[in-house]
Amino acid sequence: TPSATQTAETAEAVARTLTPRKNGELVLRLQAAALRTRENAIVPPNLLFLAGGNASVRGYGYQQIGVESSDGVTEAGRYLLAGSLEYRRPVWRNGRATDWDSVVFVDAGNVANTPAGLRHLRYGVGAGAIWRSPVGPVELAAAYGVQERKLRLHMNLGFTF
């Protein structure tokens, strides 16, 4: 029986700030991952991928995006694609920047067992605030999962990307 040791995993994550800080910044994040095996290989679920949540596709629950089984259960898949486009703008008061940023974003992603299955992206859109605290950023955002038609609150402590 083929085993999980006969696998190849590829994962890439990229985050880039595209504009200067003074007037705001445009941040782009992209994640892509693939697990290639022989078709009949037995792969432990912890080697597969799920998406959704604070550091993935906001507007969806943590690891809620996956491959839907025939009985409607979300399962991990062999391919992952996720990304985010985020605009952060400093909050100004009396002509000076404060320790706060406002943020708006669009996230997209999917998990599938074939590369072609990644085409059906799930989208999340939202807005929030980031406090640049002395110990690191604290973010609170509201995100709407477009396909799920549900609003979720997300809180991050520290850098997500």
Predicted regions and their residues:
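C-terminal structured "cap/appendage" subdomains that terminate the fold
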Residues: 118-136
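Conserved active-site loop/cleft motifs that coordinate metal ions or position small ligands
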Residues: 102-105, 138-143
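C-terminal outer-membrane beta-barrel translocator/porin domains of Gram-negative envelope proteins
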Residues: 1-100, 104-105, 112-114, 153-159
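Small/polar glycine-rich anion-binding or flexible loop at a beta-alpha turn
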Residues: 102-107, 120-124
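Short beta-alpha junctions and helix-cap segments that line functional grooves
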Residues: 114-116, 125-127, 140-143, 152-153
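Outer-membrane beta-barrel "beta-signal"
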Residues: 129-133, 149-161
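Conserved short loop/turn motifs at secondary-structure junctions
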Residues: 1-2, 143-146
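A generic beta-sheet turn/junction motif
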Residues: 19-23, 131-135, 146-148
